[in-house]
Amino acid sequence: IGIDCEFQLLKFLKSKKFKVPKPIYMDRSGLLTGNPAFMMQKTIGSSKFIGTDSKLNILDRKQLTRDIGHQLGKLHKLKIPSNQLRLFKKTGEQSVIDRLYTQLDLLPYSLPVIEWALRWLEKNRPVKRSQSLCHGDFRNGNLLIHRKRLTGIIDWEFAHIGNPLEDIGWFCARCW
């Protein structure tokens, strides 16, 4: 979404009591770093070992799961003011499939398995759902944990208006 939009989004989410880093300063000119950038208040926590931390017992894991689920549910229910909607591109299943077909057509060779998968996706498209704000990369590596609790959700550069099942899918992917 670009750093300016990400900065504005973090300000908005912080005002709604989301567990995100507090944005402090936007340097559009790149005076401080040589490139446009923004600064945030440090959020205590680490994303390492969320799934494998031996210090987390079953009750800790249940509470952490509740914390994460609460934040994600709150995000997907959030009403975005019209002046904030301009920050986001709308995405949907069809636009993703179209983009994949376009990329596939640019290749100098064919990939029949990918073509088959795209046809399957077209035929088995999920039921249309209401669109909501999505993180776009909701996974363990973007969740900060400290003292067995969720302290922050970071890396909002892929945020968009889309199907909330995208975030759930990212979170459930075994590769994280």
Q: What residue ranges belong to the model's regions?
A:
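Short loop segments at secondary-structure junctions
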Residues: 43-44, 147-149, 176
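Active-site acidic catalytic loop and adjacent metal/ATP-binding pocket
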Residues: 23, 75, 119-166
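Short, function-defining helix-loop hinge/capping sites that tune catalysis or transport
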Residues: 14, 49, 143-145, 163, ...
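Active-site activation/catalytic loop segments of kinase-like enzymes and analogous catalytic loops
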Residues: 166-176
